[in-house]
Amino acid sequence: QAVVIDREVPLASASLIGCAVLTGTGAVLNRAKPRPGSSAIVIGIGGIGLNVLQGLALSQAGPIIAIDTNPAKEAAAKLFGATHFICAGPDVDTAEAVKEICPLGVDYAFECVGHPALIRQCIDLLDWGGSCVLLGVPKFGSEASFVVQSLYNDKSILGCRYGAARPHHDIPLFVDLYKAGKLKLDELVSQTFEPEQVQEALDA
């Protein structure tokens, strides 16, 4: 689909709306629809995870807990809206770290990696009535498990494709949010390449 946008928006920044921004921010605004003050975890702080964070910030959610194995991602996570950062690893009890912040669990858990074990962890960390939103894409044919009784506490598992987006509606909306200073796009661009540098870009 082709969507006309304002010429004032830099193309390098605008190009990101059509993928990571729609997928991540759209998952929050269109699929999860959290109320202000809702607690959330985001597992996997890549391009999609960062946009989930800023969608949660736009929704006035909080606490917003970012989780990743790379400690270098903490600064970006907090720039995009995380109130807390947990560096996951073999020596860290991630579930315990989350419960130190939200003792009863969280209202929303966004899995942005695509790993069955992390999907299970998201479900286990939900509070009563919480929702797990699946964004990461696991290996084809993968299966994930959960304790059936846990879902009787009004928990939900929500699949989400492309941020449940309507491009002709959502892209102009995100452009307007960007122009109003409420949506970060420029900060998502780490480097640009000319067409003849395609191999360099692939190797970067």
Describe every region a protein language model picked out:
Residues 1-3:
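Glycine-rich phosphate/adenylate-binding loop and adjacent beta-alpha elements
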